[in-house]
Design a protein with these regions (language model features):
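Surface-exposed loop and turn segments in beta-propeller and other repeat-based domains
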Residues: 99-112, 171-180
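Bacterial Sec-dependent N-terminal signal peptides
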Residues: 1-26
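Beta-propeller blade signature
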Residues: 83-91, 151-156
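Short consensus segments that form the blades of beta-propeller domains
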Residues: 73-82, 110-111, 140-145
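Acidic/hydrophobic-patterned starts of short beta strands in beta-sheet-rich repeat architectures
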Residues: 62-67, 127-137
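Acidic, small-residue rich beta-repeat scaffolds with periodic aromatic anchors
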Residues: 20-48, 56-57, 147-150, 154-210
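Repeat-based blade/solenoid architectures
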Residues: 33-36, 45-50, 108-119
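Acidic, divalent-cation-chelating loop motifs in proteins
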Residues: 120-126
């Protein structure tokens, strides 16, 4: 599922997920359901959610994915309003939340991390009945170094807890530098279908920011 604020796109993607029996809803602060989730479950992370995703997974339960931003007061050299990122996936349990995995990255020096919401997705690429969560973000910077574009993949793969894998594309700033990609050892062990999906997200996100 690709998360966009365009209602027709969101509706279509949700109906596709329903057909696959993994039912996913995507909510922003202007949505009534967003407010209902906050009232019922609260906000378990620092900052404010820019997006909340709920996925009901048959035989596993209901998962809630928060993607939060927090404006920082400490000084950085970054032009604009620096923000820290806090994200987490939680399992609903009798009106409460059980943490499954969390993420955070902080603004510092000349840069700050920035969610690429249009490229954060939930999907079941390997069709094993449990979705993968694809968190995509960019290391925006006023510096001259190459800037990281990252896709973090959260999978379960028969385990009790979610695990993290990552692929990074380094976006060159200077003409003499070249674009390159690197992935961690965990990413290399993912099923081919999941790797290909993450690589496509990275490719599409790269086009989207250039």
């Amino acid at each position: 599922m690709i998360f966009r604020k365009l209602l027709p796109v969101v509706t279509f993607m949700i109906s596709m997920s329903s057909f696959a029996q993994i039912r996913t809803g995507v909510y922003f602060s202007s949505d009534k359901k967003y407010k209902e989730i906050i009232e019922e479950l609260g906000n378990p992370l620092e900052g404010n959610p820019v997006m909340i995703v709920k996925s009901f997974v048959p035989n596993h339960g209901s998962y809630v994915w928060y993607l939060n931003e927090k404006k920082i007061e400490k000084g950085t050299y970054f032009e604009g309003i620096p923000k820290d990122l806090y994200s987490g996936i939680f399992l609903e349990d009798h009106g409460g939340l059980i943490p499954q995995i969390t993420f955070k990255d902080f603004a510092k020096d000349l840069g700050q991390p920035m969610y690429l919401i249009n490229y954060c997705e939930v999907g079941d690429a390997d069709k094993d009945g449990f979705p993968e969560f694809y968190l995509t973000y960019f290391g925006e910077s006023d510096g001259l170094d190459a800037k990281p574009l990252k896709v973090i993949v959260y999978t379960k793969r028969g385990q009790k807890t979610l695990s993290k894998s990552k692929i990074t594309g380094w976006i060159p700033y200077q003409e003499e530098d070249k674009y390159r990609e690197e992935s961690d050892a965990s990413f290399k062990l993912l099923p081919k279908a999941i790797r290909l999906k993450a690589e496509k997200i990275l490719k599409d996100a790269k086009k989207g920011i250039q």
